[in-house]
Amino acid sequence: MTVYKQRFVLDTTAFTDRGVVDELGDGDLCEAVTRLLDLIGRARMELAISCYIPYPTVYRELKGFLERNGCPELLSRIDTWIVKKTPNRYEVKVPARLFMAYVKDMRERLDRGRKRAEKAIWEAALEAYEIMLREEADVPKERIIREVIGETVRRFRRKYRQTVRHGTLDSAPDLDVLLLAKELDAAVVASDEGIERWARELGLRFMPACSFPDMIEEYLRMSREVEG
């Protein structure tokens, strides 16, 4: 039987997505990664499906996740079943139109982030002023820092991240996933709105991380039926 050799480039979220961890590991990241590697290994041996991970950027991210969750020994299995490759950043061509669109998108996001910062400053100043008006005695500096500045900074960080980083490419690993997929004519596997959006812009196939294990299992099941 002739098998079309499919290629997939995996982002860190292909392993750490909450849906994947719950489905394959019942909430345990190490168990989920183990079972996903089992599927990837079988798919490679039986169907000639190849999975890649950008090196060193995404590989380093994934290594950190495994070490923090107490299963660094899984790196040897990742080295066995997943191809580590550095994207050819000098040869992969990206249309100038997409580059301009990305710059425009980031400029708009930074502008919205600046407005968020200005609003946070005004809110903090107003809250501090209202506290001092309510109190007849001098207000301790520590109280202003605790009740006003600290809370304002926490709110600002959350809103700034959502405004500037959510839904776009905000790191070198994200970009490497797309560049490697384009270089290899491979599908992207991730659970990241920014990667998904720009994968579409580049004309790349995209597979949600939560759907990837089921797809591999279906391929394996159908292969057994055809051969049997």
UniProtKB/Swiss-Prot annotation:
Q: Which PANTHER family does this chain map to?
A: RNA-FREE RIBONUCLEASE P (PTHR41173:SF1), UPF0278 PROTEIN TK1425 (PTHR41173)
Q: Which UniProt keywords apply?
A: Endonuclease, Hydrolase, Nuclease, tRNA processing
| Catalytic activity entry | Endonucleolytic cleavage of RNA, removing 5'-extranucleotides from tRNA precursor
This protein's superkingdom?
A: Archaea
- Function of the molecule: RNA-free RNase P that catalyzes the removal of the 5'-leader sequence from pre-tRNA to produce the mature 5'-terminus.
Checking HAMAP family in the record gives: RNA_free_RNase_P
GO terms for MF = ribonuclease P activity
Q: What species does this protein belong to? A: Methanopyrus kandleri (strain AV19 / DSM 6324 / JCM 9639 / NBRC 100938)
Q: What is this protein called?
A: RNA-free ribonuclease P
